[in-house]
């Protein structure tokens, strides 16, 4: 792999989640962030606000152009779940084919929609495609106090994958600002999600009880 600060990123789906994880790519790239990253949004009114909030250039609706312009090492793929498969077929499949035809190294794919799973991307993009599904830790601050280190980001690896140990170490480094990283199989992530949702509901109930009950 390249050194961390030399990695190039394209964000497809520059919404709230990609703004929330800005501490991760900001720490990784430092003052090279603005030249090493490019975000794409489908919302005209969000272009300037997202660029200002994240410190990276953001363009409107040109996913294919962003990929060709940046030739990214990593694609942060965060469209709405309903658009994940259509954008894979219309944008990612042609771009990966272009990379192969030119003899270029394929970019890593960080897919944020929970579905499709990594197996789908491998079927569409090739089984040598390095893809993970990612559910970031979404509780990084409570009442103004940082608590990210108590949480974890769930990274789901396809059952058959070609990720190397140093690349998995990179994933841990990238997500470190949001806490620990837990690597899961597709079967394990379903259980982990159920437990996580149950914990969230219980915590809300306990807080409501604490508020309602007398001292």
Describe each model-derived feature in a short phrase.
Residues 63-65, 70-149:
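Rossmann-like NAD(P)(H) cofactor-binding subdomain of soluble oxidoreductases
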Residues 120-130, 147-191, 198-215:
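Internal alpha-helical scaffold of NAD(P)-dependent oxidoreductase catalytic cores
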Residues 1-74:
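NAD(P)+-binding Rossmann beta1-loop-alpha1 motif at the extreme N-terminus of oxidoreductases
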Residues 16-21, 84-86, 118, 203:
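Short glycine/serine/threonine-rich phosphate/pyrophosphate-binding segments
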Residues 37-42, 109-112, 155:
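Short, hydrophobic beta-strand segments that form beta-sheet elements in well-ordered domains
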Residues 35, 56, 107, 129-130, ...:
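A structural micro-motif
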């Amino acid at each position: 792999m390249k050194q961390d600060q030399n990695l190039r990123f394209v964000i497809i789906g520059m919404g709230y989640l990609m703004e929330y994880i800005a501490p991760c790519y900001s720490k990784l790239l430092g003052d090279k962030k603005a030249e090493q990253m490019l975000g794409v949004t489908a919302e005209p009114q969000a272009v300037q606000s997202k660029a200002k909030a994240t410190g990276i250039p953001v363009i409107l609706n040109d996913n294919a152009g962003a990929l060709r312009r940046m030739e990214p090492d990593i694609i942060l793929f965060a469209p709405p779940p309903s658009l994940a498969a259509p954008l894979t077929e219309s944008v990612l499949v042609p771009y990966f084919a272009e990379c192969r035809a030119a003899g270029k190294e394929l970019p890593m794919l960080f897919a944020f929609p929970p579905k499709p799973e990594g197996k789908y991307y491998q079927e569409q993009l090739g089984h040598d495609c390095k893809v993970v599904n990612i559910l970031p830790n979404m509780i990084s601050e409570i009442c103004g106090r940082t608590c990210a280190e108590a949480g974890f980001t769930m990274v789901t690896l396809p059952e058959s994958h070609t990720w190397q140990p140093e690349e998995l170490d990179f994933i841990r480094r990238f997500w470190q600002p949001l806490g620990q990283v837990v690597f899961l199989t597709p079967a394990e992530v379903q259980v982990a999600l159920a437990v996580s949702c149950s914990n969230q509901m219980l915590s809300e109930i306990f807080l409501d009880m604490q508020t309602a009950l007398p001292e």
